Amino acid sequence: VGEEYAALGSTQFGSTINKIRLKRPDVIYAAVVGGSNVAWFKQLKAAGITGKKQTLLTLSVTEDEAHGIGGENLLGFYSAMKYFQSLDTPANKKFVTAFKKMWGKDAPIG
């Protein structure tokens, strides 16, 4: 239906989102990365594009970006995410402890 690119670091997606709203594709595949993800997801939701209405697949959302975006703006979307070390489960806590012991307390996971 369409393909559009934005410069790395872009935060204004109104034109692209308007095209999406007009064409109403079944699936939206976004390769937005970095801090641009925060603006992208918030602007999608503000435009009424949600996971309930369309399928959105995204390349990557990091743990920090997810916090900035807000869970309410990610509901219903699919992403290939990196490992989230803050996941609050016994198995994850055990893994993080073992990882930090082996690689150092400041070693990032994912």
Question: Over which residues does each language-model region extend?
Answer:
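Extracellular/periplasmic periplasmic-binding protein-like sensory domains
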Residues: L44-G110
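Extracellular/periplasmic Venus flytrap/periplasmic-binding protein
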Residues: V1-A47, Q85-K94
